[in-house]
Every structure is written in C-alpha cells, then in structure tokens.
C-alpha cells in the first residue's frame, strides 16, 4: 500500500497569478457590449415581433375614427367700419381673446346649442358609439349597480333632458379646440366613427359660435342702451336745474367782469405762476447744493472718486480736466508699478502728482459748493417774497372772491353735468347704431370637409410604435438578463471567480436520452461485442459510455483533460481516490462520474465507481432501481463491499451502488465519516488504480464535507448557464479543505451553439468552429441514439 500525499501546489489559486476580469479594464468593453447585443438579438426580435403582432391585433379590432376640422379667424377688423374709434388690440389682449374663444367653444352651453340645432339627442351614433371592451365592462357594472340600487321613476321630460345632456357631454369629449401656432386662428376638430357626422358637427360648432357672438353683442348693446336712456333723462333734468341756479346767482350779486373774473384774481394768477417757477428754481438749487455738499463731506480722496458732474453745468470744465488728468496719471502709475515695482522713482513721482491733482479737484469742489449754496439762498428768498405778496393780495380780495367762489362752484357743477350728459348722449347714440350692425368679430376661413381616411388608429404609426416599444421592452429585458447574469459561461469565469483550473466543456446531451435514463434501468452481466446493437432498455450504458463510443468528440476531450490534470497533480500516487462533487443537485455530476470512470477503465486502469450520494442516489437508480447490497450495507457491516459491486463487461468498470432500500434510515454523513468508510477506501486503493466517488451536492447536505478528508482530489462540476457563481465561490471559500483539493472545474451541459456568443471577439470560444478537423461530434448521436 504505497500512497503519496497530494501535491500542495494545486491549492494555489490561479487568481493569484492571473488578473481578474474586474481588474483588467475599468472602462466600457465595447467587445462585450456588442457580444451582448448579438447574444440577445433573438430575444429582442421576439419582443419586436410580439408587439407588432399586438399592434396588428389592435388595428384589426379597433374602431376607425374620422376627424373633421374647421378653422375660425378672430378678426377685429371685421367691425371697424361700424365703430367710430376701434379699440387697439395688443398681443396680451389678443392672447386673452383667443383663450376666451377656446373656452367658449369647449363650453357646455355651446355644446347644448349644437345638440339642439342638429338634433343629436336622437342620433344613435352619438348616444351609442362603438365601445371598447373596457367601456362594455363599465356599462355592465353601471347597469348592475342600477338594478340593485333602484331609484325614482323618470319622467319623459327628464329622460329627454338626460339624453340631451348625455349627447352634449359625448360631443365635448370628442371635440378638440386649439390655437393654430401664434396666429388668430382657432382650429375646431371633431372625432367620430361616422365621417359625415364628424363634418356636420364641426360645421355646427362653427355656426353656433358665430351665432353666439352675434347674440352676445346684441344683448350687451341692448342692455347698455336701456341703462343709458335712464341715465340721460336724469342728467338732463339735473343739468338744466344747475344752469338756472348759476344765472340767478349772477343776477342777484352783480358778478360780472371782463373775461369772467376780477382783476385781483388775474393778479393772483400771475403771482401763483411766478411762485411755481420760484419753487422749481429753489428745488433745483437745493439739489445741486446737496449733491456737492455730500461729495465734499466725504473727504478729499472719496470726493475725487465720486465727483460725478453733469455736463450741462458750465463751471465743471476745470474739474473734468483735472479728473481726466487724475485718471491718466493713475493709469501711468499702475503701469510703472506693474512693470518696475511700486518703489520705482517714477511711480513715486506719479503718485505724488496724482495726490496734488486730487487736492486741486477737492478745492474746486469746495468753491462750487459755496457758489451753489449762495444760489440756493437767493432762490429761497425770492420764493418767500412771492409768498408774502400772494398773502397780501389774498387778504384784499377775500371779501369779493367769496361770492365768486360760490358762483364758480355753481358753474363747475353745471358744466360737469352738461359734459356728463353730452358724453352719455353720444354713448347712447353709438349703442343705438350698433344694434343695427349684426357683425361678429370672427369668420370661418376653412370649412369642415368629409374625411376620406380615418385619423385613428394610424396603421403605420401604430406598427412603428409597436416595433419601437417592443424593441425597448426587449432591450430592457435583455439588459436585465445581462445584468442578472451570475452563472458560469466561460472557462475564464472559472479562473477569475473561483481561482481554479477549468478542465473544459461537456456538451449538452439530448433530452430524449435523459428521460429514458430516468424511466428504465440497465442490465449487466452479459458481455457484448462493440459492434453489437445497444438495446433501448440500457440507457445507462449509453450515457456512461459516451466517452468510449465517441473518443474523438469534444465530450471525450474534456474527460481526457480531466484525467491529465489528475495524473499531473496527483503524480506519485499508485492509487488515487477522486471525488466528483457539485454545488447543487441535478448538475449532471453522476453522468460526469460515470464517463470519467469509464474513460479510466477503458484505458486499462482498474477503476471502481462508488455512488456515495446516499440521500439521492441517481447513479444507483440508473444501474438498478432496488439493489440488495451496496455502500450502505458495507458500512453498517451487513455485507462485504465486493459482494455489492456490479461490473460493466465492456469497459470492465466496477460499480458500487449506494445500497438497498434501507439506506434512507441511516445518517449519510456519519456513514461517510466513519472508520468503516476509511477502511473501505483503503481496501479499494489496494485493489484498484482509481477510485471515483460520486458525492452528494455540497450546498444542501454535509456528505461531501464528511468524505473530503478521504479524497486525494476533487473534480468539481458546475452546470453551464445555471449554477450561481457566487454560491459556488462562497461554498468553496467556506470549506478550505474541499477548496484545496479541487483539481479543476468541469462546465457541464454546455450549449455549444450558444457558447461562442458569450465570448469576446478574441476569446478561444469564438474559434471552436475551427477545431472540427480534430473532433467527430456526430458519433455521440450515432452511438447513443435509441
């Protein structure tokens, strides 16, 4: 019994010497993006076809609707010859008028007028239009609710009014009113399943709107005329009474004078005019004085900076010249300081000159301030003098003017009443004239015609939108699938995620063969020649001999690569115990174990295949549904292990099944970790060159962990495109012993037709079609067909 310890070099993860995909590039990989697009193109195309089919179904069952449109121009010029002074219209008023017109056209009152004029309350097309399935359900629910709730009897008049209101509500829903761009045109469109009815109602709306405008103008003018006539009668009586009162007051007080006023009043008027001028001069002088005083009060430096002098003043030329010189010197000083430094002699000289000019400007400002102060005091004195003169004259004429004031009050009252009367008289005559001009400020510029083609649904647009929507939904779903891709697709995924060696791809087998493998069992014991026909009742032999029947296939090449990896990494061991494990059930590890063992046996090596998946013995079920003895009976001491071995006469493969029906009563993990199991493995090492053990899945049970110390190496099986990568990574990282004994990972059930779609353009999977001269894939189908 010579046994060499497993080489520790296999426990070194490949991730330590190979960069991961996440570390390779932080930018968007265009190759992967294009590959994803091509990979999901069929899915997106299927969604596009589906949505186009839905769009076509919608077009097939949808009710066609026709739209007829009329255009109304709101033109103020239509009534300008009927108005003496047309009101000018600005853009804001125009927007308001058009908005008001749109709301009037949408109003329920105008809809009722259209219903009454066209008798739409008796039109079945309006009251009972074609309904969608949703509308039919709503109508059914409404009817059912009405049956249970009941209600008072409806009179014929109420029913007629209800139909009228319903027709108005329906045409309001089918009406579309909008302004045409920024023009004064309003477009009125009506939508109906009957093209002739659509044109009729659109015309009816235009006619009803024009009639409404005429009626509104006439009614407003009539109401204004009645009110103006009442006001005119009252104003006429009051104006006559005021005129008589003025005449009587003049005659009683003898108030007659030239130009209708006293001399003292004329003098008072002249003085008042002079006082107004003097007040203006005083205010102007005060403003100038305050301006210069505020500048001077700021000090020399700020006064120079803030000395803003009006160009209309004649005494500021000196200040302007000095200020110009100040700015010029300051500019030169900054240039010299920037070029030669602030301590340069010329810069110092220029700053001194600038300060001197500032002092001169300040002195000039002080002189101007004193001058304007004198002007302000003179103007103030003149204003005070005029006030005193006015007060003196006012005292002399106060007695005479008291009666004149009363007279003027009477005259003003009479004049105001006369002016008001004349104004109302003119408005009354204008309103009377407008009643005889029935002109609306709108006209129809485009008559509604009968549409010849439906406006909805639009076939081309519907199908195009369906295609776009299908592309968007399909693209979103494809992107979701791509972002949710968390499985193993490529050998590079094995290296980057798990840090282990990938042993290759095992192609996906036909479903017909696997279904038979679950329904019937194989028969052993008789030796058959290689050229004999394989019976349909032996699917296990077919599945387990694929590697033998198709030696030049991709399937067989993967197992040869696995054998080579085992021989290299377990070199020095005369007998090797190799476990076959997976993370989840139904990943095909039993078929992998059977073919791997068959390859070893066919190569002339003494090989034992043990089904150690005691809880779910898939390998045993394929061999014989109810074996009498097996692994469990051996471990509990009921039988010896050679008694339970089955031998494949073709490959000379020895197979030890899981056991009989009683194996479910025992704790599988305790059996696999028992001394009896260790003794069995030791005995098997002495009798066989290779011992291949089919273990239970690693995630659901601990059986694989219990057996791991007895294995020299582990071949890990993952299902292509289904096994979650994070699950496998976490399981292996949480079990260092198992992880250290993993010889490599096999990607099982690989769809070889889809494999290249998941690879980069420079990936090895893209060039597998060039390996055809080395492989003969059709032998798998020929030699394993039923």
Curated annotation (Swiss-Prot):
Give the record's GO CC terms.
plasma membrane
Q: Which residues lie on this side of the membrane: Cytoplasmic?
A: 1-42, 712-786
Return the Pfam families for the record: CbiA, GNVR, Wzz
**Pathway the protein takes part in:** Glycan metabolism; exopolysaccharide biosynthesis
Gene3D superfamilies tied to this protein: P-loop containing nucleotide triphosphate hydrolases
Q: Name one GO molecular function term.
A: ATP binding
* Compartments, as annotated in UniProt: Cell membrane
Residues that bind ATP: 583-590
Its Gene Ontology biological processes?
A: polysaccharide biosynthetic process
- Which residues does the entry place in the Periplasmic compartment? 67-689
Q: Chief location of this protein? A: membrane
**What name does the UniProt record give this protein?**
Succinoglycan biosynthesis transport protein ExoP
Please spell out the taxonomic lineage of the organism that makes this protein.
Bacteria, Pseudomonadati, Pseudomonadota, Alphaproteobacteria, Hyphomicrobiales
Gene designation per UniProt: exoP
């Amino acid at each position: 019994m010579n046994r060499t310890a497993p080489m520790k070099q296999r426990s070194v993860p490949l991730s330590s010497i190979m960069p991961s995909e996440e570390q390779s590039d932080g930018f968007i990989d265009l190759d992967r993006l294009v590959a994803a697009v091509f990979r999901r193109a069929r899915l997106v195309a299927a969604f596009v076809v589906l949505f186009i089919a839905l769009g076509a179904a919608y077009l097939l069952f949808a009710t066609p609707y026709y739209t007829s449109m009329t255009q109304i121009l709101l033109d103020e010029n239509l009534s300008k010859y009927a108005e003496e002074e047309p009101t000018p219209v600005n853009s804001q008023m125009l927007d308001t008028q058009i908005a008001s017109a749109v709301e009037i056209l949408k109003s329920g009152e105008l809809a009722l007028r259209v219903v009454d004029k066209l008798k739409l309350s008796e039109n079945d097309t309006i009251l009972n239009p074609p309904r969608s399935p949703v509308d039919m359900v709503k109508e059914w629910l409404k009817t059912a609710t009405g049956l249970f709730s009941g209600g008072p009897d409806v009179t014929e008049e109420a029913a007629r009014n209800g139909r009228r209101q319903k027709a108005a509500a329906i045409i309001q829903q089918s009406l579309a009113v909008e302004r045409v761009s920024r023009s004064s045109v309003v477009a009125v469109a009506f939508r109906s399943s009957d093209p002739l009815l659509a044109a009729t109602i659109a015309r009816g709306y235009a006619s009803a709107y024009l009639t409404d405008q005429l009626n509104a103008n006439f009614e407003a003018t009539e109401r204004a005329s009645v009110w103006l006539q009442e006001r005119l009668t009252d104003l006429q009586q009051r104006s006559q009474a005021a005129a008589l009162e003025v005449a009587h007051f003049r005659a009683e007080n003898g108030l007659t004078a030239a130009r209708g006023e006293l001399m003292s009043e004329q003098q008072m008027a002249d003085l008042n005019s002079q006082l107004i001028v003097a007040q203006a001069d005083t205010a102007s002088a005060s403003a100038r004085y305050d301006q210069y005083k505020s500048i001077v009060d700021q000090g020399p430096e700020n006064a120079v900076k803030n000395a803003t002098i009006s160009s209309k003043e004649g005494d500021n030329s000196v200040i302007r010249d000095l200020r110009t010189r100040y700015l010029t010197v300051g500019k030169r000083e900054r240039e010299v300081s920037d070029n030669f430094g602030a301590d340069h002699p010329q810069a110092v000289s220029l700053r001194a000159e600038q300060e001197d000019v500032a002092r001169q400007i300040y002195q000039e400002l002080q002189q101007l301030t004193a001058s304007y102060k004198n002007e302000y005091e003179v103007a103030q004195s003149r204003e005070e003098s005029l006030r005193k003169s006015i007060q003196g004259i006012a005292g002399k004429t106060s007695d005479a003017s008291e009666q004149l004031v009363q007279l003027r009050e009477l005259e003003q009252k009479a004049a105001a009443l006369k002016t008001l009367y004349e104004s109302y008289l003119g408005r009354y005559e204008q309103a009377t004239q407008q009643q005889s001009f029935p002109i609306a400020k709108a006209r129809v510029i485009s008559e509604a015609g009968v549409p010849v083609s439906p406006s909805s649904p639009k076939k081309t647009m519907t199908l195009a939108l369906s295609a776009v929507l299908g592309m968007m939904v399909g693209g979103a779903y494809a992107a979701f699938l791509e972002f949710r891709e968390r499985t193993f697709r490529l050998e590079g995924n094995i290296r980057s995620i798990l840090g282990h060696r990938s042993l290759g791809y095992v192609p996906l087998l036909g479903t017909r063969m696997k279904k038979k493998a679950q329904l019937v069992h194989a028969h052993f014991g008789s030796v058959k020649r290689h050229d004999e026909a394989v019976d349909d009742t032996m699917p296990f032999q077919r599945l387990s001999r694929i590697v033998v029947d198709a030696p030049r296939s991709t399937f067989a090449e993967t197992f040869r690569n696995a054998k080579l990896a085992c021989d290299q990494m377990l070199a020095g061991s005369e007998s090797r115990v190799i476990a076959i494990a997976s993370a989840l059930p139904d990943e095909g590890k039993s078929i992998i174990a059977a073919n791997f063992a068959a390859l070893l046996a066919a190569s002339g090596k003494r090989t034992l295949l043990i089904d150690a998946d005691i809880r779910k013995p898939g390998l045993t079920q394929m061999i014989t549904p109810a074996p009498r003895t097996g692994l469990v009976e051996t471990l509990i001491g009921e039988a010896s292990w050679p008694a339970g071995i089955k031998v494949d006469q073709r490959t000379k493969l020895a197979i030890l099944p899981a056991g009989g029906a009683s194996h479910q009563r025992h704790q599988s993990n305790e059996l696999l970790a028992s001394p009896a199991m260790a003794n069995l493995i030791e005995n098997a090492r002495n009798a066989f060159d290779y011992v291949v053990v089919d273990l239970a899945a690693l995630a659901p049970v601990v059986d694989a962990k219990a057996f791991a110390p007895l294995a020299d190496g582990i071949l890990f099986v993952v299902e292509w495109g289904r096994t979650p990568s994070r699950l496998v990574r976490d399981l292996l990282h949480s079990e260092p012993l198992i992880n250290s004994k993993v010889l490599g990972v096999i990607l099982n059930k690989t769809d070889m037709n889809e494999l290249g779609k998941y690879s980069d353009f420079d990936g090895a999977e893209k060039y597998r079609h060039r390996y055809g001269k080395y492989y003969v894939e059709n032998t798998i189908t020929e030699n394993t067909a039923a």
